[in-house]
């Protein structure tokens, strides 16, 4: 959520800032704003409710000159979406401007203290409290901006990524972070600042990922300086980031989401590259090689995740338990961190997050560390916080995912969990050789079978028009298909705003069957596997109650075709790999229904791509 961009250098800052905000639109937001220091030392703050395009329209006749500036997209946490509550916020004197991602937990206490000292506030936000606090300290003690920020952060409780400019010190930007990401791009006599690498990569591939507790000082013509609140200088690694600008463009597709759905065959190929050797019939994960003892000695594995990543975790649980014979628990990270879990050094904790910045998952990792657990991270964003906080892990290597509703990250996570389960099972000797070889071979064929499945796009597009009337959907699956049903329901909810629920098919008769009537479409994942006959019975029960059945079936299934209203035939694969195939039609169905309803599929309302606050 919330996107931060900053620039200081020889260029005009405004175009850089606007383009950066556009690159961060995928994170979700309800308002946007910018603050610029012009060549005469004037500070100009412009902000508005709505999109970045609305901000550009608002600024069309404004003074947007200057080579120093910050900009922000806001997703409301304190105070309703409005131009007043939008960032940047400025101090009472109008000398300072700040942008902020995160939550200041003790803002109410700080605000009360400042009000008692005579300060007034324009907005309802926690962010304005912080900029007023910085200026109060600055004026009371006659300090420079850096020292004032350091003292202010001493008093702050919470998570934050902030950037400040001061028109009295116009040649610098101060940035700081705690439990919220910030990246600095180092150019030629210039610095770029952002929440992630996407706004920066067009200008430089040299980047510094700030660690928790860091305060960065960016001054034109000087080296990057990083200190802590006690003004102790910190070592800051500057790394070269391998990310191409073309990877974050739409590439001719109408939406990022559709582009990312169609990228999945290539993404899964990239995910498996160097990890699966079909000729040698072998799976190699460096993390398993390097940390074999810690992983194989685990008495239990806890997987923590949120949203779509949690659904991937459920599939990983079945893979690991089936083939490694290690008990696995899957928990929402938000619940795990607060329920006093019984964990110890005998446990391995797997943390899954596309962005690597999910606040609850990061907090769960911190808790696991306190209990001496061995921690394995599965992430997409290279250099993000979770990989830096874990003992080892695997990147999914699916490239930037811009659409808020996750698609290719889900299949990437499932692929890595499958590789992990196979590698561990092989090392433990808990999988039969013929089973291992057959799964490895079939896994190598998944990208081609994904391509086959994507050829159903036109069919699913036509199908979606039939069901735009629906107010509710039910998704059913069993075994490995149950998490796919959950994920399909989530996708529909996220982008079409249609209520949808995913259930194990066997649980239908324990409640959901009461909802089924002629207005209730039911999506059933009914491929040929050990529970095929039982799922067939579920379909017959739905039809007996006049429900509309959309069935995902194995190719050539005539039996279900006779009774289902709509049938989508899928390429055959092994049961444990079916989620990688079956999820694609559900992604397409959600996408096309949302498009038919005129929804913004890339930026659905109230959602954020990277949830960096609780």
Question: What positions do the PLM features span?
Answer:
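Structural motif
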Residues: 68, 96, 300-302, 348, ...
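Glycine-rich, anion-gripping cofactor-binding loops and their flanking helix/strand elements
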Residues: 183-205, 334-368, 507-543, 573-587, ...
